[in-house]
Design a protein with these regions (language model features):
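Nucleic-acid endonuclease domains
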Residues: 1-59, 66-165
Length: 165
């Protein structure tokens, strides 16, 4: 298993550490689906041609974007990506199968989100408008600047999302 190998190698390295691999999107997307179902009783659909998931209920369509991370490295967004709600999956404790899911009920067109400072000089909106990929760390950039717009909706072991138990 690559995660175990990375962890073991990092114990022996004193100057440079090996960064964790990107968290697999198909896993983060399913974690979010089941976290939404656990919280709201609504199961998003993964079969969508835009974004990562969608909720279709009573003629209302909610486009969902999902970002998973295992380190403080930046999450990257396509400059033309569109969503109605954004979810971050904190997979830093993936070795123990513990995850956190954060919900942000802001679209990428919302001024609060567009005004997130990703650098000293540029906001999310300015970078996206210039057709470049906005990038930022959830813990260092998004969570602190979003404040009450960023809600923890799940914090626990993956087995807690199994609605068949």
């Amino acid at each position: 298993d690559n995660l175990n190998l990375t962890e073991k190698l990092n114990k022996f390295l004193s100057k440079k550490k090996i960064r964790n691999e990107n968290f697999p999107s198909h896993i983060s997307e399913n974690i979010v689906k089941f976290a939404i179902f656990k919280k709201y009783g609504i199961m998003p659909c993964w079969d969508t041609n835009k974004g990562d998931a969608v909720i279709n209920k009573m003629n209302i369509r909610i486009q969902i974007e999902i970002k998973g991370f295992m380190s403080d490295g930046p999450s990257s967004f396509g400059p033309t990506e569109m969503w109605d709600m954004l979810y971050f999956v904190d997979a830093k404790d993936t070795m123990n199968c513990n995850f956190k899911v954060y919900e942000i009920k802001l679209s990428n067109k919302n001024n609060v989100f567009r005004n997130i400072k990703l650098s000293k000089k540029e906001t999310y909106g300015e970078i996206a408008d210039s057709k470049r990929r906005p990038r930022g760390s959830f813990e260092k950039i998004f969570k602190p600047q979003l404040g009450d717009h960023c809600k923890l909706i799940f914090d626990g072991h993956i087995s807690e999302l199994d609605n068949t138990i």
